[in-house]
Amino acid sequence: MFFKEIVMNAVNASFTDYKVADISLADYGRKEIKLAEAEMPALIGLRKRYAAEKPLAGAKILGCIHMTIQTAVLIETLVELGAEVRWTSCNIFSTQDHAAAAIAASGVPVFAWKGETEEEYNWCLEQQINVNGKPWDANMILDDGGDLTALVHEKYPTLLDHIHGITEETTTGVQRLLEMWKDGSLKVPAINVNDSVTKSKNDNKYGCRHSLNDAIKRATDMLLSGRRALVIGYGDVGKGSAQSLRQEGMIVRVTEVDPICAMQACMDGYEVVSPYKNGVQTGKKEDINLDLLKNTDLIVTTTGNYHVCDSAMLDTLKAGAVVCNIGHFDTEIDTNYLRGYKWVEVKPQVHQVYRSENENDYLILLSEGRLVNLGNATGHPSRVMDGSFANQVLGQIHLFQEKFADLPASEKAAQIRVEVLPKKLDEEVAAAMVLGFGGVLTQLTSVQADYLGVPVEGPFKSDAYKY
């Protein structure tokens, strides 16, 4: 044999602090984790860089993020750097059961399986927080969407006395953090991982470019070429989604509220339209732009906002159209309204929603309006998630070393904030990713650096620079 055989997980029967769908999937998960590690040079580089220092020794992290193969690499990186973790998924459909099994088999407490009910999802969060009937002495939070952060603040506020900080992965969670900071309910500092360039451009844009069309094709087996799509929102997620559909040959239109994003869509060659006449969202069927919606084969929401695909739009949309969401929560599409109709499950996370007794009058709803690329497929590639998760690790180290919880009470208020990682750390993640692609960065000469007014080793752009 010319290669080293992968050592499979040996499940310790005495370890029971987990709940997954099928622990026997652990070996399968371990094989995929090894493949993912080869595609995640930034994370593996952090393991090597901090192997001796163990900067997270003493960290006890509550983690709530999609329990995927790529997340398994993140978890094991945190553990290798000294942390203890307890994990849940942030979405009822996004868990990859073999990934959860592999993590459980390695001795890490994890509570996640694909297809949880809302009640089971909440149960998992409670199991994560509580050990032997009382709250775990956690001192860090790693979140995606803000559910864990909200639960700790609202139900377990005494835990916050020991929490050094929160790192938040996604747009929706950052919005919630900013609201909490504004109204004074945020009690610890937080790092906005979402707006690191190596997260927002990789995950939000390039990741969605890869994974959206993959999810739709797996769910429907449809040829997308020549069909008409409406992308709601043209932020980074919307940009990647529009590219994803265009590269499949779809005719893509965009709807936007932000004139700058709308201008970008125009410059990128997309027609900017509105589902409502004159762009005024009244919620009334008589004000719907019928010419648009009756000629739309696919709607995808990308905004992180509320009811951007509302009941009036759903009732007037072309029969047989596909409706899906690649934002975080299921509130972008008014799925509660659709619950009043007859649902027929075609296969897991694919439903025909019949709007009348006419057998042809249905919509195809994917992932019940939740995150389609993880509900109907396997999400972003490992190489994309490498940047996001390297930022999470650096954010956890940054906040853990600040030791907010150890500050005198009189000094804490001034330290509560929501901020992005320093640009130098963002550039370090990017450099590791470039190296992973086999790229070679050119170094500035001292003369060039002086001319630009930047250090030779960076950071190379001001904080105001728009990538």
From Swiss-Prot:
Pathway stated in the Swiss-Prot or TrEMBL entry: Amino-acid biosynthesis; L-homocysteine biosynthesis; L-homocysteine from S-adenosyl-L-homocysteine: step 1/1
Residues the entry annotates as binding NAD(+): 170-172, 204, 233-238, 256, 305, 326-328, 373
GO cellular component: cytosol
Cofactor: NAD(+)
Enzyme class: hydrolase
Organism superkingdom: Bacteria
MF GO annotations: adenosylhomocysteinase activity
EC number: 3.13.2.1
The protein's name: Adenosylhomocysteinase
